[in-house]
Structures are given as structure tokens and as C-alpha cells.
Amino acid sequence: MLSWWQSKQNNSWRVGVMPADRETALAIVKTAKGQRPLLRHCAIHPAIEIKAEHVLAPLNRTREFARAGVSGVLSTQDYELVQVEAPEVHPNELRAAVRWKLRDIINFPVAEAVIDVFDIPRQARYVETRMIFVVAARGEAVDRIVRLIKPRVRRFDVMDIPEMCLRNLSALLPADSQGVALVALGDGFAQLVLTCQGILYLARRIELPSASDPEGRAGIDAAGVALELQRSLDYYESHYDRPPINEIVIASGDARAERLRDELITETGMSVEVFEPAELFEVAAGVEPDLRWPGLIALGAALRAQGSRS
């Protein structure tokens, strides 16, 4: 199995790839300590125009990208991210020990799952049970991405999930120093992550009307989103004994972000901003980042070197 979370590397290019049946998202970023990341490419390539393997082919023909690290990202339907009580075992035995706990939690056979774990930040003093995040991925989905990417690049070294990709993006936000809520809008859902100083504290999926409704103008239940946000923020404060988060950032790559921003300001009274890549990246000339869900996630995957393992 590939290592899902490896040590960070500075002063290097990284490629984020999110393949799907209908499209492949590809992002290329260079990170250097003390500098804003350089965004060289962030696009979604429809399968009807170019196959996924052809999207990757130019990487080996370009000298500066040929040795770039490559992160592949699982689609949301191909894994589950859950919290479980941490078994009292040696760290090397942790994956095997949590597998049996997943039998009644995940919705596919645990025997078919590829398992990885990472720490949840320390809970408040009155919470005695240590919890951990567990990623259970469908083995066939992991194999499919490996077969697609590994033969076509030199350094395919990370398999990632969207929540961790969003964590990487959230860590770039100025408000992350005190804590920030990033809301990424997909087709039919919003993914919320709460981070502080680059650490993922909470991830929650919120169901929404499909963005593919006629004319793409499906309304979002802002009151419902605000309620889920408030529940998550309250949990963050009480469970982790943290100061309140005061800023929400929305990313969607379309007009929904601005509409939801205006509505959430009214619903919550909090500071709500739209994710703007030009404020966080040095964007190469001629690059117009596509920040719809697949592109946004690929961009976060390409920032893998920006964050340390939480």
C-alpha cells in the first residue's frame, strides 16, 4: 500500500490528480518555505475530450515536472472517514486493531477495505476517551487509481482523501492561525472542515440540492447550512476546549459561493468570505484555476507539501 501521509518536502513541485469516470482534475503547484505557493495548473479535463491517461502523459515530457511528487485522490463514494476509540496497542498495530471496530460502521465489507489512521487533536480535559480518525477505502478504488497513475509518472507517492486536501487549502488561509471554517460546495453536498494552525479538527458532509438542476440555479438552504455550521462550531469549542472560530470561507468555483456568502452573513452574523486563489497563490500567467469541486480537491492534493501530518 502507498503511504497516505508522508513527511513534507519543501522547494518542490507536486501534482494533484483526482480521476473520475466523466472527468479528471489536475493541479500543479510548487511550494517553497517562506513563499506563497506557485500555481502552475488547475483544470478539469472532461473524459469526452481527453482520457485520464492522456491528461497525465505530458508530465514525464516536461523536465521540471518529471520528478514531481504525485498525489492521487479518492472520490467521495470510494471511502469513509470515521472516528473510533483508539485501541491501546503499539502504533505499528493500530491499523489492524481498528479494523474489527469498522465492521458495524462502514457500509461495505471490512475485508475489502484499505485502512489508515491519523490522530485527532487532544480533546478537552473532561473527555477521557482518546479518539482517532480512521479512513476505510474500497480496495478496488485504490487499485484503480494506482493502475491509472503509477505507470505514467515517476513519483506517485501519496493517496489522499478530499477532507485532507481541503485541510491543506484551509491551512493557507490567514484565519487558520486562530481557527477557520472552510465550506467547499460540490454537486449535491457541502464539505465542511474546521482547522486551526494546519490541524484538522472536524470534517462534516452537508447534503445540498444538486448544482446540476435546470439552469444551475438550485437554491441552497442557507438556514440549514447555518444550523449545521453552528452545531459543528459548538462541538469544536466544547469538545476541544478551543476559542470560537469567527470566520467562514466558501469555495465553489461558481456563483453559489457568493450567494451562500451573503445568506450566511445574515444567518450567522459571522465574517464570511469567498475563497480567492489569487490571494493565497502566485498564479502563473495565463492560468485560470477551475475551482469546481474536482479542481479544488486536486489543488489541495498538490499542496500536500504545505502541511504536516496532523
Predicted regions and their residues:
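Hydrophobic/aromatic-enriched cytosolic interaction surfaces used to assemble or bind macromolecules
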Residues: 1-310
